[in-house]
Amino acid sequence: MEQGQDTPWTQSTEHTNIQKRGSGQQTQRLEHPSSTRLMDHYLRIMSPVGMHKQIVYWKQWLSLKNPTQGSLRTRVLKRWKLFNKQEWIN
């Protein structure tokens, strides 16, 4: 992704803070946004039904007990594909 693009995703994941040095040069410093700002953005773009599905999905993902890395990747990919397919149907 190019730096010049101005998308909601880049706005929500990083905040550009421009500071002036003593010599007058401008430098950009990337800061992490606050978690509440990210959550507000997420709540605005998600419907209540979509948010509920996402919460259920992550609770199931977090409940996995020490799976091997390969099986974890397989289960997550299957779940994610199923979740995305259901989103398109609904």
UniProtKB/Swiss-Prot annotation:
Polar residues bias (residue ranges): 1-28
A Pfam family annotated for this UniProt entry: PB1-F2
Chain positions covered by the region annotation Mitochondrial targeting sequence: 65-87
Keywords, ordered alphabetically: Apoptosis, Host cytoplasm, Host membrane, Host mitochondrion, Host mitochondrion inner membrane, Host nucleus, Host-virus interaction, Inhibition of host innate immune response by virus, Inhibition of host MAVS by virus, Inhibition of host RLR pathway by virus, Membrane, Modulation of host cell apoptosis by virus, Viral immunoevasion
Marked site positions, Low pathogenicity: N66
Matches recorded under InterPro entries: Flu_proapoptotic_PB1-F2
GO biological process: symbiont-mediated perturbation of host apoptosis; symbiont-mediated suppression of host cytoplasmic pattern recognition receptor signaling pathway via inhibition of MAVS activity
Domain of life: Viruses
Location of region: Disordered: 1-34
Subcellular location: Host mitochondrion inner membrane; Host nucleus; Host cytoplasm, Host cytosol
GO cellular component labels: host cell cytosol; host cell mitochondrial inner membrane; host cell nucleus; membrane
Record keyword Mitochondrion present: no
Tagged with keyword RNA-binding: no
Family of the protein in this entry: Belongs to the influenza viruses PB1-F2 family.
Further information: Is not encoded in all strains, and seems to be dispensable for replication.
Quaternary organization: Oligomer. Interacts with human SLC25A6/ANT3 and VDAC1. Interacts with host MAVS.
Primary role: Plays an important role in promoting lung pathology in both primary viral infection and secondary bacterial infection. Promotes alteration of mitochondrial morphology, dissipation of mitochondrial membrane potential, and cell death. Alternatively, inhibits the production of interferon in the infected cell at the level of host mitochondrial antiviral signaling MAVS. Its level of expression differs greatly depending on which cell type is infected, in a manner that is independent of the levels of expression of other viral proteins. Monocytic cells are more affected than epithelial cells.
Protein name: Protein PB1-F2
